[in-house]
């Protein structure tokens, strides 16, 4: 048995179209604006467009593997078999933020169709060959991303993008409520796609759980979770019925199964999108897919699948099925589809050759340039900006300015931090402060005491007890112009969620060449514990993992006056350069 499965799958589509073209029987032509099926929202014209976008995606995968044979490409994780996600790309708007699965080729082609003049196929090829002309990552990593299409690039860390997608969905209404301008419409929704193996990860479950939790609290959460189910995690099969059993009957989460013909998938997706946009609630779209050609080009699929299993998978190729649907419905003739396929192959391979001639990053300085932007003049200017007019600031602090306070508790490190947080909330309407117990209680060490009362629950609020979700909210909020100051209650708790900093927040500017950013300050009480208490449950000195993350700033104040100045500088650094600042607060020095 030959294992050049790319050639076999390509030949199967060619064979079907040739046989159909030779057949004497042909259905009556379907008018371009007629539905593909009675009662369906998918027209013949749109179905043909979808098929063309699917063909482009498939040929990008073919080109990546062809170029790899001569060491001219560096990414062979394909979208082959997942091309029905094209329907999601076509039905969402380009100002609906999208956090995408790595098999999103067809989705991106359809999304880009909405932007005249865009060149998504060539852009993708530039990423595959690691060219510095790649408009999103400039050759640093092959990602699906685009600033004009509102697709922040994602890492391939399993499930790590679900919390921040949830965070952005939560923050849409919050920003509008606070009067913070975004570039998104009021009815925007968030798309978050992932695989069936991914959804078992604790990080994925955190994002979905927090979305449901928000609905229970009566908060808007307009997010469409799309699980692209190919029933396989590299070599490990997903048990039959697992996804439906796990997510099909959860309260506060709508579930839709998208399978069957392309028009059936279209109509199911349309209903899910309509629900999320109208109800401002989350939905879980279960999209049936098939994985062709292994996990990636380096994956020897025959080592864990029989020849019969591989052939059975290939028979379920969505392009083959969709071509048959177009021909049998009269939406397109075999000759039209053959011409479209030949033209797509020629265009994509020509573009691939052109991409290999484009420049690449040559120096370390070029590669790391967007990792840690630093503009000290701008930072100082932001930090030195007058806090408020004198009368307003005096009123904010209850008639006594913090620098003139004589009460001992106001001069402690905790007291100075409280005053500095009040100043930042007072002068920056985009600042929000949140975490476990920071609102009504005022923090377990009273550092945020009274701030919710002064600034309201829209800006100072409590979260559920999940550090991953707290950092996800911070990232999502920062993506749309808010400036989050999030609290992780103890340093010991940060390690549960550290990849949200390491793999996600700290890499966004790097992978997007500075086009996307997530400025934030993360307050973390830690180090030596308060006198009279001990044990390993809350206190932690482990900051090595933080110091190992490129681009992250770590600040550790030791005195009250330093703490206030450092916090002001941290917020200014986040605002000016989009930086992620970890602000470690020594518990033993609070009071």
Predicted feature residues:
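Conserved acidic/glycine
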Residues: 1-85, 91-92, 293-455, 465
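Cofactor-binding active-site loop characterized by glycine-rich and histidine/acidic residues
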Residues: 59-62, 66-223, 233-254, 534-536, ...
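Thiamine diphosphate
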Residues: 83-86, 150-224, 232, 259-275, ...
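Short acidic, glycine/serine/threonine-rich loops at helix termini
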Residues: 88-89, 109-114, 202-206, 234-240, ...
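Short beta-strand segments
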Residues: 99-102, 159, 165, 169, ...
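Conserved thiamine diphosphate
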Residues: 182-186, 239-271, 314-342, 511-576
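Conformationally flexible catalytic loops at phosphate/diphosphate-handling active centers
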Residues: 196, 563, 569-591
């Amino acid at each position: 048995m030959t294992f050049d499965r790319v050639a076999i799958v390509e030949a199967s589509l060619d064979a079907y179209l040739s046989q159909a073209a030779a057949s004497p029987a042909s259905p009556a032509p379907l008018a371009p604006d007629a539905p593909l099926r009675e009662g369906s929202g998918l027209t013949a014209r749109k179905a043909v467009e979808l098929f063309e976008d699917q063909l482009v995606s498939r040929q990008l995968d073919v080109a990546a593997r062809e170029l790899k044979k001569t060491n001219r490409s560096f990414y062979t994780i394909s979208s082959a078999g997942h091309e029905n996600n094209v329907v999601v790309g076509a039905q969402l708007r380009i100002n609906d933020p999208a956090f995408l699965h790595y098999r999103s080729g067809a989705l991106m082609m359809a999304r880009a169709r909405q932007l005249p003049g865009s060149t998504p196929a060539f852009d993708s090829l530039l990423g595959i060959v690691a060219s510095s002309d790649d408009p999103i990552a400039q050759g640093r990593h092959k990602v699906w991303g685009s600033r004009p299409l509102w697709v922040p690039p994602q890492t391939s860390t399993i499930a790590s993008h679900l919390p921040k997608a949830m965070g952005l969905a939560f923050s849409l209404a919050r920003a509008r409520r606070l009067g913070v301008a975004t570039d998104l419409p009021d009815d925007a929704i968030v798309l978050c796609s992932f695989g069936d193996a991914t959804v078992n990860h604790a990080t994925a479950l955190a994002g979905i759980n927090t979305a449901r939790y928000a609905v229970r609290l009566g908060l808007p959460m307009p997010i469409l979770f799309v699980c692209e189910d190919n029933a396989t995690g590299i070599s490990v099969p997903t048990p039959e019925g697992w996804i439906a059993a796990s997510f099909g009957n959860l309260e506060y989460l709508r579930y839709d199964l998208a399978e069957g013909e392309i028009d059936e998938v279209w109509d199911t997706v349309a209903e899910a999108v309509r629900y999320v946009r109208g109800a401002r609630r989350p939905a879980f779209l279960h999209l049936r897919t098939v994985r062709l050609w292994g996990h990636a080009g380096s994956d020897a699929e025959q080592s864990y699948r029989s020849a019969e299993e591989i052939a059975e998978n290939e028979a379920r190729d969505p392009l083959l099925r969709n071509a048959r649907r177009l021909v049998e419905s009269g939406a397109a003739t075999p000759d039209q589809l053959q011409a479209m396929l030949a033209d797509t192959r020629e265009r994509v391979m020509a573009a691939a050759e052109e991409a290999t001639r484009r420049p690449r990053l040559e120096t370390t300085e070029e590669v790391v340039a967007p990792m840690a932007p630093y503009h000290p003049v701008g930072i100082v200017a932001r930090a030195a900006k007058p806090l408020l007019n004198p009368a307003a600031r005096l009123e904010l602090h209850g008639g006594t300015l913090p620098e003139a306070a004589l009460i001992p508790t106001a001069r402690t490190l905790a007291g100075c931090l409280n005053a500095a947080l009040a100043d930042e909330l007072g002068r920056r309407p985009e600042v929000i402060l949140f975490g476990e117990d920071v609102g009504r209680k005022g923090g377990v060490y009273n550092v945020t005491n009274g701030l919710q009362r002064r600034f309201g629950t829209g800006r100072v609020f409590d979260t559920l007890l999940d550090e991953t979700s707290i950092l996800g909210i911070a990232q999502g909020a920062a993506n749309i112009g808010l400036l989050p100051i999030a609290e992780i209650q103890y340093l010991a708790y940060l390690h549960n969620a550290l990849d949200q900093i390491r793999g996600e927040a700290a890499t966004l500017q790097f992978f997007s060449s500075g086009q996307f950013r997530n400025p934030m300050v993360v307050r973390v009480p830690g180090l030596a514990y308060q006198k009279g208490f001990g044990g390993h449950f809350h206190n932690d000195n482990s900051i090595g993992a933080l110091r190992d993350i490129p681009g992250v700033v770590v600040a550790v104040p030791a005195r009250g006056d330093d703490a206030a100045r450092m916090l002001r500088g941290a917020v200014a650094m986040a605002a000016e350069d989009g930086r992620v600042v970890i602000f470690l607060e020594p518990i033993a020095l609070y009071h």
